[in-house]
Amino acid sequence: MPPFTYSDDTLRSGRDRFRDHSPSQHRRSMSQETDSSASTTSIVFDRIQERLDTKEFTPRGTDGDDDGSLKDELNNDDLETGPFLGNADSSSRSDQRSPGDGQRMDRSLRRWLFIVSGVLVATWVIGLFVFVSSKAYKPSSSFAHDPQATVTHGTGKKVTLDQVLNNQWRAKSHSISWIAGANGEDGLLLEKEGVGKDYLVVEDVRAQNPSSVQASKSKALIKEKLFEFANKTYWPSITVPSRDLKKVLLATDVKNNWRHSYYAVYWIFDVETQQVEPLVPYDVEARLQLASWSPTSDAIVYTRDNNMFLRKLGSDKIVQITRDGSADVFNGVPDWVYEEEVLASGVATWWSEDGQYVAFLRTNETGVPEYPIQYFVSRPSGEEPKPGEENYPEVRQIKYPKAGAHNPIVDLKFYDVKRGDVFSVDISGRFADDDRLITEVVWAGKQVLIKETNRVSDVMRVVLVDVGSRTGKAVRTVDVNAIDGGWFEISHKTKFIPADPVNGRPDDGYVDTIIHDNGDHLAYFTPLDNPEPIMLTSGDYEVVDAPSAVDLQRNLVYFVSTKESSIQRHVYQVKLTGEDMTPVTDTSKEGYYAISFSTGAGYAMVSYQGPDIPWQKVISTPSNPDKYEYVVEENKDLAEAAKKHELPINIYGTINVDGVDLNYVERRPPHFDKNKKYPVLFQQYSGPVSQTVKKTFAVDFQSFVAAGLGYICVTVDGRGTGFIGRKNRVIIRGDLGHWESHDQIAAAKHWAQKDYIDEDRLAIWGWSYGGYMTLKTLEQDAGQTFKYGMAVAPVTDWRFYDSIYTERYMRTPQTNLEGYDSAAVTNATALSQNVRFLLMHGVADDNVHMQNSLTLLDALDQRSVENYDVHVFPDSDHGIYFHNANRIVFDKLTNWLVNAFNGEWLKIANAQPNGMKKRAAPTA
């Protein structure tokens, strides 16, 4: 279960039920408000003085109409044409007064008004002085976003749910498709649909800066966006150039399969002639699952109907590599669970660098049970129902291995392009078929590094296969039970380091992430079969998804780590000897960075993601003697919006629970007042190795809750989450839900003791694993601390989730039945002690099946528990998007939370009928 993040990409636009009904008030800037406030006071004084100085000011006697008439005049924008303070009866009443009385009243009123005016002027001057000296008059547009701010400066517009759902707060970001030149040139990128350029161009990254004189000339690969074949027009949505840049593989008519995989029609485009031909000559409309170039640019391997084929360029001949592909046997592409949990990709094919061999995964899921996904509204297959079946839902059967069920059997196969045969290499000591996961495949010259684990991911073997001799051996075996009792996370970042004796590398090797110093650290293994590495990093921090790049010319390894702080990310470099680790990004300031390197590591796209306004720039790296820097994105519009809006005040810190320091962020409403008592919404994900508290810029749903609704929103990353040390991570092994919920409850009790918190209005919410944790926390707390909860697409019993993810943390139900029973959400009586909770789920969720929510509902029914609301979404998967569903999710969360904190749900228990209204009397 990869962390489900309700990022801006996840949110969809729609009707805002909390739209401001007086938009002009919010559109007004602070400067306008300040001007109007000051000028209104002046206008009042000017109006009084104007009337005092004119003949029209003829005060009346002391009858009861005077005050009302004065107020009416001061509030009237239209000047009267008759006597000031006059009305229809003024002449008749004034005729009854004596001239002497009128003059005495005039002087008396004048004296009184001057005294009052003097006092008001003095008060106004003093107030103006204080106002100006405090600089509180400054409009929000004068204050740049300050992530360190602990108070709100000025005033501004409110953050709205519409803005969040419409991605108005999403930082603009760019990605670079780095590509090596035909002769190995570094710093080239692939640009599609550039302004004023051909459709697909290879360009020197330095050409992005108009003032650069070093940039090489760009090369157009595809000039026109559309192409024609057999009198039909096509548009390529995917373009993949060959390494020699002479051909481009095009994909049209792309249709998604699962999270990463898709089907498409493929074409070969010739750069020189700008002509196209179908990849499958005899079947122009053939829909393929995968196609990939040989590194030598002379062949393409593809998968169709789960069988693999090879086409050599310059020939229409198709060579069939496998013949056993079927609905249950996959070649070169993963099945559902391997795509979702192991490869995080639709690709299970790997070319050797010399183009002589193809390694591929063969997956046999014959023994894997099926799970039906029902579609009641749509027909994702695109097929029309058979006559008489129009009123039945479409059902898609997925081979889905739940915890403890049969796993797919995987084997790594090799195809020898020259010999034309498929072979495998048997290695002694391998895991049994139903106890084997193949998690990573890396070519190392003529050899292949293969990582495999047992099915519960606590024993790993690194296997080295020589495809020339067709032999292999295990070069490293690690039992994590002997280290800390945890598990191995899957990684695809192992980097092959070829030998270069002249450059100080006598043997081939590889850089990998291993368990060291209570965390994940980088290690360099050389030669390939050496089980003892050179440690490149060590200490009380961790590397993140490392390494990022390797500079083979200068023996430098680049990586991202938490060295400065567990909630920050900075980029570093270190030599392959483990010496001279230095930062690439500015560590003197807080920062959360991501980085993308060119193929030769001489250039990089640096992405600053927070805590201030995000920006991006391309730089030359320490590997490049020619200095270069170009700002790609500054997000000026976002910075301007941040100035004009009242954003939440984000307070970061740690809370100590059972001797463990846990990171938190508390989002406070603008103009936070410590003398008030605020409701609190706890938002969390809490999944193993995940992280939600981090120093990034984000205006998301949680920000809206704080800045738009005026509640406090807290996130605490409890034990089991990432980057707080393996000791605090692996404590959850075999017992999911216990420590995570314990930490959320402890945090809630801590906040409940704060003077500015309303302890009777605490709620918690989450999606996916966060939904599970919401329910588990409510169950464990039983209404003592949390009163409300909102769970979206939750797991409720880990026996219902997929085997590879679940067993990594829980082992199998056969060996840990007590742990599975404890981890399930089953205590309906405890849930009944909460005031109320909300449950939402997509009916067509292929990841966390609807079975989870339905089973919980049945348990609640059996105990006659009714303090909950349910909303299901037909045909929606785990993201819940179908037919405006995502918008409704967040509308529902908002409305439900407001009702909860307003006490509406307190009125539901033991509801009694109101008295009947009397019928209106009939009219005559």
Swiss-Prot record:
Segments for region (Disordered): 1-104
Residues in the Vacuolar compartment per record: 133-924
Pfam families: DPPIV_N, Peptidase_S9
Keyword field contains NADP: no
Main localization, broad class: membrane
Entry annotation: catalytic residues: S768, D845, H878
Positions of transmembrane segments: 112-132
Keywords, in A-Z order: Aminopeptidase, Glycoprotein, Hydrolase, Membrane, Protease, Serine protease, Signal-anchor, Transmembrane, Transmembrane helix, Vacuole
GO CC term, one of those recorded: fungal-type vacuole membrane
Subcellular location: Vacuole membrane
Keyword flag Hydrolase: yes
Positions annotated with a glycan in the UniProt record: N231, N364, N827
Topology term for the membrane: Single-pass type II membrane protein
Gene3D superfamilies: alpha/beta hydrolase, Dipeptidylpeptidase IV, N-terminal domain
Residue stretches of biased makeup (Polar residues): 31-43
GO biological process: proteolysis
Single GO MF descriptor: serine-type endopeptidase activity
Ranges annotated as biased composition (Basic and acidic residues): 9-23, 47-58, 92-104
EC number: 3.4.14.5
Stretches of the chain found on the membrane's Cytoplasmic side: 1-111
Job of this protein: Type IV dipeptidyl-peptidase which removes N-terminal dipeptides sequentially from polypeptides having unsubstituted N-termini provided that the penultimate residue is proline.
Family: Belongs to the peptidase S9B family.
PANTHER family: DIPEPTIDYL PEPTIDASE 10, ISOFORM B, PROTEASE FAMILY S9B,C DIPEPTIDYL-PEPTIDASE IV-RELATED
The protein, known as: Probable dipeptidyl-aminopeptidase B
Organism annotation: Sordaria macrospora (strain ATCC MYA-333 / DSM 997 / K(L3346) / K-hell)
Top-level taxonomy: Eukaryota, Fungi, Dikarya, Ascomycota, Pezizomycotina
